């Protein structure tokens, strides 16, 4: 009976961790990554279109992203979209290909990004704890309605806490990995 409550809690905690992973891909490290451009929208015949749907993105070198537009006339639109996205990147074009050189991050910027990552981790932990609270409330409701015994309630709450601890540890690991990646020169 209480397994459904725990399953629901795991699902909520999974969402918090997945959201954190997705958010962390957008955090700029010293390395080039096409995920930096995920939110860049290009005006394609009057329709805002994701950059990866109007050209091929590649990372030929650790500090370089190249964009090969599928239509040459989109070069200027893509450059404009990158400037508008305010990523701190300056696109250069040779008429066929757009190059984005990722500048090395300053020490101050690295520390700033580390703080951002820690904040993301804390937000994810809040999501995990919220799922725990909902699960504990669900367990208490089951016990109140006499669907489970008091022993089952205690056992369930302990299991929920164990699951919560494992997810918090997973979040801490993700945050420390990303911080290490940011501080790497």
Curated annotation (Swiss-Prot):
Segments traversing the membrane: none
InterPro entries named in the record: Ribosome_recyc_fac (IPR002661), Ribosome_recyc_fac_dom (IPR023584), RRF_sf (IPR036191)
Protein location: Cytoplasm
GO MF term set: ribosomal large subunit binding
Residue numbers spanned by region Disordered: 127-156
GO annotation terms (biological process): cytoplasmic translational termination
Highest taxon above the source species: Bacteria
GO cellular component, one term: cytosol
Purpose: Responsible for the release of ribosomes from messenger RNA at the termination of protein biosynthesis. May increase the efficiency of translation by recycling ribosomes from one round of translation to another.
Protein name as it appears in the record: Ribosome-recycling factor
Organism of this sequence: Syntrophotalea carbinolica (strain DSM 2380 / NBRC 103641 / GraBd1)
Lineage, broadest ranks: Bacteria, Pseudomonadati, Thermodesulfobacteriota, Desulfuromonadia, Desulfuromonadales
């Amino acid at each position: 009976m209480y397994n459904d409550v725990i399953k629901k809690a795991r699902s909520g905690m999974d969402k918090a961790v997945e959201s954190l992973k997705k958010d962390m891909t957008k955090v700029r490290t010293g390395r080039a990554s096409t995920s930096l451009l995920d939110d860049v929208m290009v005006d394609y015949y009057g329709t805002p279109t994701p950059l990866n749907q109007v050209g091929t993105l590649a990372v030929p070198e650790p500090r370089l992203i190249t964009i090969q537009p599928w239509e040459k006339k989109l070069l200027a639109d893509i450059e404009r979209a990158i400037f508008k996205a305010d990523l701190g990147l300056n696109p250069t074009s040779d008429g066929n290909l757009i190059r984005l050189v990722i500048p090395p991050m300053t020490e101050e910027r690295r520390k700033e990004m580390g703080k951002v990552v820690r904040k993301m981790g804390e937000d994810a932990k809040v999501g995990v704890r919220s799922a725990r609270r909902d699960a504990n409330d669900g367990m208490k409701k089951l016990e109140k309605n006499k669907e489970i015994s008091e022993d089952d309630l205690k056992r369930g709450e302990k299991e929920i806490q164990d699951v919560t601890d494992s997810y918090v540890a997973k979040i801490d690991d993700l945050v420390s990995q990303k911080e290490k990646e940011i501080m790497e020169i």
